[in-house]
Structures are given as C-alpha cells and as structure tokens.
Swiss-Prot record:
ATP 2 binds at G327, P328, N329, G330, T331, G332, K333, S334. It is a peripheral membrane protein. This is Putative HMP/thiamine import ATP-binding protein YkoD. Belongs to the ABC transporter superfamily. InterPro entries: AAA+_ATPase, ABC_transporter-like_ATP-bd, ABC_transporter-like_CS, ABC_transpr_CbiO/EcfA_su, ECF_ABC_transporter_ATP-bd, P-loop_NTPase. Residues 8-250, 295-523 form the ABC transporter domain.
Length: 547
C-alpha cells in the first residue's frame, strides 16, 4: 500500500434508528487516508448504506437516529457546526437509490444546485457542468427532466452532481447496480481514471466486484450483525479468506470463482486467466422451453410524445420458462414491463394472456394471474409492516398466514416482520417485493432487476426461488444487467436495442454467435464466453501470422 495522509477517522461508531433497537452497525473503527481507495463489503442489511450516510454527516440528523462513537474529517468531528456546513464540499455520497438525492427538475439545474451552494460564479459553474457531463458521456441529458430518465441514467446524473463539486472523499453506494453491463464496466474504469487524475479518496459499497477488486487495494468487510469482520489487502482477503467471505454472503469475483472451479492458480486478473487453455465441457447446453404459450405480444409499440421508446415488438412467453430481458440503459425495458402489466397503455399492438386481450380482464383477476415486481420496490409498498405487506389483498386465514411466514423465513425477513417496509435496507426491500408477488399463484411473473441490492447468498436464494416458481409452470420475464445470471438461469433472452427487439433466442446463441450485437447493445460476455472469445482471437491472429 502507498503512504497517505489521514483524511477520515472512524472510532467505535455505532448507529441505530430507534433507542430500543439493536444497532444497525456497531463498534466500527478504521482510518481512510488521502487518495486511498477502499471497498466496503457485507451482507445485505448489515448497515453499509447507513454507515456511508454517517460518514458524511447526513445521519443521524436526517433520520433522528442514535449514534455513538466519532467520525473525524480532517481531524474535525463531522458533527461540528463549522464542519457540517461545508461537509458536502469535502465528502460526497452517491446514494443507492439516486431519486433520494434529487431536488430539482432538470439535469442541468440539479448539478447547478450543489455548485450554487458553494457560491461558484455562474460562468465557472457552466464550465464545470459541461465538463462533468462530457466526462460521464451524458451531455445529451443536460436539459432533460430527471423524472423521464432511466434508473441507470439517474445514477450517472447523481455522480455528476458529486464530481462537479470536486470533494476530497467520494462514497459510492452500489453505483453500478442500475447500469447496463458495458456502462458498468465503463463507469468503473472511469472512476479509476478520475481517482488517479484527481487524487480523491474513494469508498465503494458494492456487491458486484469483478471490475473493482483488481485495482482497489484495501477491503473492509462487515458481518451480518454490522461489526467489522475483516480489514486488509483485497488480494489477500479473496485468496485466503474466500470461505469466510462466502459464508457472509459476499460475491467472490467471477474470475476467482472460475479458477477455483477449474483448480487453477489464484489471480484477480482475468487477463492472466485467459492465458490458460479452457478445460473441455464447461459450456452446458439447455433445452429450449416447450410449454404452451401463456403471453403473446404482437407488434407492440410505445411512445412518449413524439419519441418512440420501442416499436413493433413481438415475442411470446411459455409456461415453465425464464426469459431474460436485456439491453442498454434507457431503451425502455422497465417501460415494456409496465405495458405488459397493463400499468401503461401501448400506442399500438396486442397483448394476449391465455389468448384473451389484457383489457378484457378485470383488474383483480389480472393481478391474480400476473405479478409485477417494480425496479424501485418502494413503489409497491402500501402497509406499515413487512408482514402486513405479504398479507395485503389476501384472505386472512391459517393457510395464507402460513405461506407468509414461510416466505419471510425463505427470504431472510422473519426478524423484520414488524418493521416498516420503508425502514429496511434496499436489499431487504427487494426481497420483500419479490416475496409479495409469490403470495399469489401467478401464471406470469414480471421482475424488474430482482437481484438488485442483494448479496451473493440472498441473490442465489432469490434465483432458486424463481426457478422453483418456473418449475411449477409460471412464465417468468426478468430484466437484468447480470449476464452471468442470464447464462446460468435463463432459457431464452430478449435484447432491446435501438427501439426494437434485436434478438430472441438462447443465451448460448447470443453469447457465442452474436458477439457484435452484445457489443452494440452494451452488454458484456459472461466470463467463460469472454475467455472463449479471447482464445479464438489468439488463434485467428496466429493463423494470420503463419500466413
């Protein structure tokens, strides 16, 4: 590790939302130096996001929480009046849910808001706004209404707001979770370049570690109770503490997982892995789904004003199948799900559920047959407790209560049964939103990023639950940015690109035969397919050289 000067000091920090509750996290102590980059890992619900908000002084004041211990920024307590007034200039947080930090209508005004608070002159402000938009490649969003942006675009805007103020410390809370795979990789490389150029300190909370782990030297790990479990060099932790990390529900970088599976030497570098020959028999073929068609979509189009979001889309969902819906940010994937769920009206086209148009179904009947999990789970919560959320709209009897208890246990939410749905972590909210849909025996299940915000263990449990639902005959359509998940679980893939449906086929066909489309649609190849493509390029180069 390099030698740094002290920037942030955390001493025996604990935090809880209510006086009689056990702490969300407890007894956390560490130092963060100027220019240092650190990964903050831990299972879903262990207090990572709450810790981030304590570090820049938003908590406990913003939530009437209870905090003990100390946080020092430049050796001054962040709770000091003088420090708290200027802290956003020194320590910026990009929230897990970007909507929570926006207060203006347009992108330009949102970035300007923070700069105005720093009393930046107007001419300089305009230069800073244009520079940061160009740096993040979102200049085309400058005059857009924030409410019209996709989740991934909002996340980039939130980062732009922080970068424009040039803080000494940037805290990123799952910054790539809403980005398409190409944009996520691009984002990480951008942060790497920016950090080296500007020299700011960086604290990253993340579940997807493949792009971060090779260059962020230090990692801090929290356990389920919110205590610090590990703190050390990233390479050492993944090499020597992999089993401990897995037990905590932390996703091991895919390169580590693959080399362990293939009994190969340890490395965090996929470039090193790709130099080795691929063992035979590691790409398994799947049978095409053979169930009857449940949902038929024909020539479906949707527009906002004069702007076409998607047009002339046709596909079908079959009983007992899992279809992945993928594509770049802003292509209308979430909008398509809303149209399929009859929450938005299409401009043209037909949607048939069991050969009957959606509009022929009564609302209550449609909801019993079709479940929809929103990208933002808070949009579907209507009760005051986690338990009541599961029972909402159900007949109160022993059978439904038993099913609710089973789902609480299955999704690791039993200890939160009496909590308000808005007071649990983002990962827990996501699990609750999926669980509520499983209270109904739906025939079609629409899922918008079901594993978003989940640690490795709960994401795997969520997918296994979806697999069981699929095995019972339900047709599942799932938006995801995780191509490894697509490769492992999906029976078929739909690729939305350039307002149309660019691909409808198997994952193996997409990743092995349509690599040009993978690149155009801002996807990434699963690691094994990327390895295969790399070795094919090497063979082609060798052939050209030999001639």
């Amino acid at each position: 590790m390099q030698a740094f000067d002290e920037l942030l000091t955390v001493e025996q920090l604990s935090f809880s939302y209510e006086e009689d509750e056990k702490p969300v996290f407890q007894d956390i102590s560490f130092e963060l130096q100027k220019g240092e980059c650190v990964l903050l890992l831990g299972p879903s619900g262990c207090g990572k996001s709450s810790l981030a908000l304590c570090l820049n002084g938003l908590y406990p004041e913003a939530c009437d929480g209870i905090q003990s211990g100390h946080v020092f920024l430049f050796q001054k307590p962040v709770t000091d009046a003088e420090t708290s007034e200027t802290i956003t200039q020194h320590a910026g947080v990009v929230f897990q849910d970007p909507d929570q930090q926006f207060c203006m209508l347009t992108v330009e005004d949102e970035i300007a808001f923070g700069l105005e608070n720093l009393q930046i002159p107007k001419e300089e402000m305009t230069e800073k706004i244009n520079a940061v938009l160009e740096k993040l490649r979102i200049t085309h969003l400058k005059e857009k209404m924030i409410s019209t942006l996709s989740g991934g675009q909002k996340q980039k805007v939130a980062l732009a707001c922080i970068l424009a103020m040039e803080p000494e410390l940037i805290i990123l809370d799952e910054p790539t979770s809403l980005l398409d795979p190409f944009s996520a990789r691009e984002f990480v490389h951008l942060m790497k370049d920016l950090q080296r150029e500007k020299g700011f300190s960086l604290l990253v909370i993340e579940h997807q570690l493949d792009e971060w782990a090779p260059w962020i030297e230090r990692t801090i790990v929290l356990d389920k109770s919110g205590k610090k479990a590990l703190d050390g060099l990233t390479k050492n932790l993944f090499q020597h503490e992999a089993e401990t990390l897995k037990k905590l529900g932390i996703a091991i970088p895919k390169v580590c997982h693959l080399q362990e599976k293939l009994s190969m030497p340890f490395t965090l570098s996929k470039e090193m892995l790709f130099k080795e020959p691929i063992p035979a028999g590691h790409v398994k073929k799947k049978k095409a789904p053979s169930g009857e068609s449940v949902l038929e979509v024909s020539s479906l189009s949707f527009a906002r004003g004069q702007q076409a979001i998607f047009k002339d889309i046709s596909f079908s969902l079959r009983e007992g199948s899992l279809t992945a819906l993928v594509g770049p940010n802003g292509t209308g994937k979430s909008t398509l799900l809303s149209v399929l769920a009859s929450l938005m009206k299409p401009q043209s086209g037909k949607i048939l559920l069991y050969d009957q148009p959606l509009q022929k179904y009564k609302e209550k009947e449609l909801r019993k047959r079709m479940g929809f999990v929103f990208q933002n789970p808070e949009h579907q919560f209507v009760t005051d407790t986690v338990y009541d959320e599961l029972l909402f709209g159900q007949k109160a009897n022993a059978e439904t209560e038993k099913k609710a208890q089973h789902l609480l246990q299955r999704f690791g939410l039993a200890h939160l049964a009496d909590h308000h749905p808005f007071a649990i972590s983002q990962g827990q909210k996501r699990r609750l939103s999926v669980a509520t849909m499983l209270m109904h025996d739906v025939k079609v299940l629409l899922l918008d990023e079901p594993t978003f915000g989940q640690d490795a263990r709960t994401a795997a449990e969520c997918m296994e639950m979806i697999q069981r639902i699929k095995a019972e005959g339900t047709a599942v359509l799932m938006i995801t940015h995780d191509m490894e998940l697509v490769s492992s679980y999906a029976d078929s893939v739909l690729v939305l690109h350039d307002t149309g449906l660019a691909f409808d086929g198997s994952p193996a066909q997409l990743f092995s035969q349509e690599t040009g489309l993978v690149q155009k649609a801002k996807l990434t190849l699963p690691l094994l397919y990327e390895w295969m493509a790399f070795q094919e390029e090497v063979r082609d180069e060798a052939t050209v050289t030999s001639h």
